[in-house]
């Protein structure tokens, strides 16, 4: 009887030991899997993002509003920040205050260790130089001692205009610069208070179309546009065909050349990869259509990203 009891006790001990070993192995596996998940799996992407755009009347702001609607369909809330433009957008991105920003090509230098990454170029942005009536201009060097509006403070227009002028020896010391808004610029040109004004904007912009149609204002033909593109990789030479804006009214009245930069969308390097992919798919729908100077499907692309 004692032997039977002893054997039974041994069997129970063996069974308990087996159970402990099995459960111990299970717990060990669970712990290992949990550690792996914590180490390699990223947390879910946030549902709130911020984008630095531009002024309310500009293309960047309108693009951002369309992004907001598209992202809302995927449960993401996008806050659109109105800004002065590229320079302010770059500053907001660099300080980590926004997740996305539109930055005009060639205005800022994004370094390799920067917290900013270029996603894609989204459109051409021609450089228009509008002139008061009667002021004929063939070369930027002829702007010496003239009254020239170079765009508002903090804008990509100002940065690019000053850069182009400096390439031809024109600067604030030998030229009268002003920093007016679009509307004030148009008024000043019509009143002959300015000799010339730089505007960087899409050909689809109503401001550009109105200026080209205005008989009191002329637009410069950048005859040396090709030469500038060899001096700066982020500039393109584009020909605006006669009649492309309005065939019936024949606007513009003749072909002319412009320089063009690009509008680029940039993101924070810490932005969740899934969200970057989602934004790319939205960009293809918004920017993939053709316009007066761009073929369908040309944008978005990586040709002009920095």
Stretches found by the model and what they are:
Residues 105-107, 135, 172-260:
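Pocket-lining segment of extracytoplasmic ligand-binding domains
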Residues 84-127, 131-134, 202-207:
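Acidic, polar ligand-binding/catalytic clefts
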Residues 1-85, 94, 112-115, 123-124, ...:
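N-terminal hydrophobic or amphipathic helices and topogenic motifs
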Residues 50-52, 79-81, 100-103, 118-121, ...:
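Soluble periplasmic/extracytoplasmic beta-strand elements of cell-envelope proteins
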Residues 43-44, 121-122, 140-142, 255-260:
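Short, flexible turn/loop "capping" segments at secondary-structure junctions
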Residues 46-74, 125-191:
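Bilobed "Venus flytrap"/periplasmic-binding protein-like clamshell domains
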Residues 248-306:
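Segments of small-molecule ligand-sensing domains
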Residues 71, 75, 97, 102-105, ...:
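Sec/Tat-exported extracytoplasmic proteins
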């Amino acid at each position: 009887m004692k032997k039977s009891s002893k054997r039974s006790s041994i069997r129970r001990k063996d069974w308990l030991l087996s159970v402990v070993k099995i459960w111990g192995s299970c717990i060990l596996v669970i712990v290992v899997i949990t550690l792996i998940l914590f180490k390699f799996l990223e947390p879910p992407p946030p549902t709130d993002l911020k984008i630095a755009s531009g002024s309310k009347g500009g293309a960047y702001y309108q693009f951002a509003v369309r992004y907001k609607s598209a992202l809302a369909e995927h449960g993401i809330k996008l806050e659109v920040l109105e800004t002065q433009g590229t320079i302010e957008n770059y500053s907001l991105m660099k300080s980590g205050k926004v997740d996305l920003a539109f930055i005009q090509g060639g205005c800022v230098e994004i370094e390799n260790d920067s917290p900013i990454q270029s996603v894609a170029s989204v459109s051409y942005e021609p450089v228009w130089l509008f002139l008061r009536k009667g002021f004929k201009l063939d070369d930027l060097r002829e702007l010496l001692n003239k009254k020239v509006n170079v765009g508002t403070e903090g804008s990509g227009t100002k940065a690019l205009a000053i850069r182009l002028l400096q390439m031809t020896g024109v600067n604030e010391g030998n030229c009268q610069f002003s920093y007016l808004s679009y509307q004030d610029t148009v008024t000043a040109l019509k009143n002959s208070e300015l000799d010339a004004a730089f505007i960087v904007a899409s050909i689809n912009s109503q401001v550009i179309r109105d200026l080209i149609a205005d008989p009191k204002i002329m637009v410069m033909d950048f005859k040396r546009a090709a030469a500038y593109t060899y001096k700066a990789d982020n500039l393109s030479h584009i020909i605006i065909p006669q009649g492309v804006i309005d065939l019936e009214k024949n606007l513009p009245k003749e072909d002319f050349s412009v320089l063009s930069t690009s509008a680029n969308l940039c993101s924070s390097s810490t932005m969740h990869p899934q969200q970057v992919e989602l934004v790319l798919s939205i960009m293809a729908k918004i920017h993939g259509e053709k316009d007066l100077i761009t073929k369908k499907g040309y944008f978005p692309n990586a040709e002009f990203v920095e």
